[in-house]
Amino acid sequence: MTTTYKILVLPGDHIGPEIMAEAIKVLTTIETHRPNLHFNLTTDLVGGTSIDTHGVPITQSVLDAAKASDAVLFGSIGGPEWAGVHPTPESGLLQLRQHLDAFANLRPCEFLVPSLVGASPIREHVVKGTRFIVVRENCGGAYFGEKKEEEDVASDLWVYTRPEIERLARVSAAVARIMGRSEDDNQAATVWSADKANVLASGRLWRRITSDIFAKEFPDITLQHQLADSMAMLMVRDPRRFNGVIHTDNTFGDILSDISGAITGTLGLMPSASLCGVPGEGHRSNGIYEPVHGSAPDISGKGLANPVAQILSVAMMLRYSMGLEKEATAVERAVVKVLDAKSEGGLEIRTGDLGGRATCSQVGDAVCEVLGPLLQGKKA
């Protein structure tokens, strides 16, 4: 029996189509070695290309197609040719998130490739072994609260409700369980909840409701509370301290996610996800999967783009929207084999941003070549 997954593919602008082509190669490779899986791909426009064709950064038909899909694979959007255009290309992504109610943003921070730890601006002995995921509430808080702005005074209402906090807590718990399974020990990862309960009423509500949910529904998962400002400091001094899942609101999640990106020092390797539901509950959970980096118009069309973040976004999609852990892990292991130094047993096939000379398509081809045997149960 074949299981079919509907995926909406939105390559976007500039390097978006280039890196997306390599991600689709990965899905095709999985289909070749997993005859019981089929990925039904529909490709459409978003961002600047949608503005050029339709006059808007995303059409209603694309929004409807996204809601009817099992997942959305998103490229990158924007560029200087759309400067001053309103609505902006980037607003297409915001509309997509709002339409799907993609309330949980996931940003991994880890050194998947051992020999690239040196890319971090922080000393290797401090960051080596770091592995956490920031789970950020994406649809509430100060960014979406009522705003007042006058000549000499302005305010942003920082509001959270019980349902908003509860649903994110359930996502954080699910991600902690999935992290534990991926480490082959079946022990859920620790969840670190970041707030400002010492000064913010919304922070006290956040801490109380998060504690209630974990005590009642996830008593086996370790929950720790940390003030967000001290977490930001400690994340730089000792990032391994927070290995596991960081569960936090929109504002603090925005800040902590950017710090996590600086820790790795390699935006070209960083995927992300915005989930519309709790993963791993025996049903499909829609989500938007995209690289963290931008559209890089300076290298567009030159074959220089690094496709790895887009490929790792595929791995996140397989894991969180489809529950295909073995396939997700195989994709990650293929990436490690391709990028890792020859001295570490890797192929050291890298694009220019990582000090190599390989083209975008050469990296994608190499990942697929390694992935095939891994899907058959062979070692890389």
Swiss-Prot record:
Its cofactor is Mg(2+); Mn(2+). Its main location: cytoplasm. SUPFAM superfamilies: Isocitrate/Isopropylmalate dehydrogenase-like (SSF53659). NAD(+) binds at residues 79-90, 294-306. Its EC number is 1.1.1.85. It is found in: Cytoplasm. Catalyzes the oxidation of 3-carboxy-2-hydroxy-4-methylpentanoate (3-isopropylmalate) to 3-carboxy-4-methyl-2-oxopentanoate. The product decarboxylates to 4-methyl-2 oxopentanoate. Belongs to the isocitrate and isopropylmalate dehydrogenases family. It catalyses: (2R,3S)-3-isopropylmalate + NAD(+) = 4-methyl-2-oxopentanoate + CO2 + NADH. This is 3-isopropylmalate dehydrogenase. One of its GO terms (cellular component) is cytosol. One of its GO terms (molecular function) is 3-isopropylmalate dehydrogenase activity.
